[in-house]
Amino acid sequence: MAVPAFSDIAKSANDLLNKDFYHLAAGTIEVKSNTPNNVAFKVTGKSTHDKVTSGALEGKFTDKPNGLTVTQTWNTANALETKVEMADNLAKGLKAEGIFSFLPATNARGAKFNLHFKQSNFHGRAFFDLLKGPTANIDAIVGHEGFLAGASAGYDVQKAAITGYSAAVGYHAPTYSAAITATDNLSVFSASYYHKVNSQVEAGSKATWNSKTGNTVGLEVATKYRIDPVSFVKGKINDRGVAAIAYNVLLREGVTLGVGASFDTQKLDQATHKVGTSFTFES
């Protein structure tokens, strides 16, 4: 099993707890298309419960033989971003990427340079913000027979100071995984567990404790049930009594509908509930 990136050591549990729940926005739409000359387009739009709308247009060109990918994004805030990726050119498993952003309204500019190096039992990354600081964030994970251990650290060059550090351990198996992370300078601890019970049922949970704020432990549990090959339902609830449900179905080839809702079970008589929908079109 491939060694994940540091931020993905608890990915299975985090995806089960957070992905495909549609209540966070009143409505979202995503349109994807591909051209014969290796150019992919994606248009996204979102309307929040506060009636704020936003959107983005993305174009991506991929040259697989040379390991080159160029992505250009333009959003409704009139922010422009260009991302250039080069994979496996200098060394097998090494990917370099440059991210350049520009906001015409304020003339703000951004430039970032990132490195990803992946081998069978190692996954390391380095993120450099060239115009702010500059700053560097580096993380790495080593793995052996499913066992994982990793750490991350941030450094501000101008201040000559470490800006933060984290650590994590985990275990990944084909049908289950577990991870313990310590973030925010080893002050916020999380333990997560994921289990693929069978081809239809998945279950997971996550407990979080912030040593700076007290003894209260936050808990979330979630499950996913695949009804048939084209649809599934998900549900979750946390220790505060906030529950969420979601339904996802492939209406036809290239068209997916998602519907979700959240409820505060402690305040069922109040207008704290949220409902959202999502449409995805892909060609």
From Swiss-Prot:
GO terms for cellular component: mitochondrial outer membrane; pore complex. Its main location: mitochondrion. The keyword Cell inner membrane does not apply. It holds the Pfam family Porin_3. It is found in: Mitochondrion outer membrane. Keywords: Ion transport, Membrane, Mitochondrion, Mitochondrion outer membrane, Porin, Transmembrane, Transmembrane beta strand, Transport. GO terms for molecular function: porin activity; voltage-gated monoatomic anion channel activity. PANTHER family: GH26960P-RELATED, VOLTAGE-DEPENDENT ANION-SELECTIVE CHANNEL. Consists mainly of membrane-spanning sided beta-sheets. Forms a channel through the cell membrane that allows diffusion of small hydrophilic molecules. The channel adopts an open conformation at low or zero membrane potential and a closed conformation at potentials above 30-40 mV. The open state has a weak anion selectivity whereas the closed state is cation-selective. Belongs to the eukaryotic mitochondrial porin family. This is Mitochondrial outer membrane protein porin. It comes from Neurospora crassa (strain ATCC 24698 / 74-OR23-1A / CBS 708.71 / DSM 1257 / FGSC 987). The lineage of its organism: Eukaryota, Fungi, Dikarya, Ascomycota, Pezizomycotina.
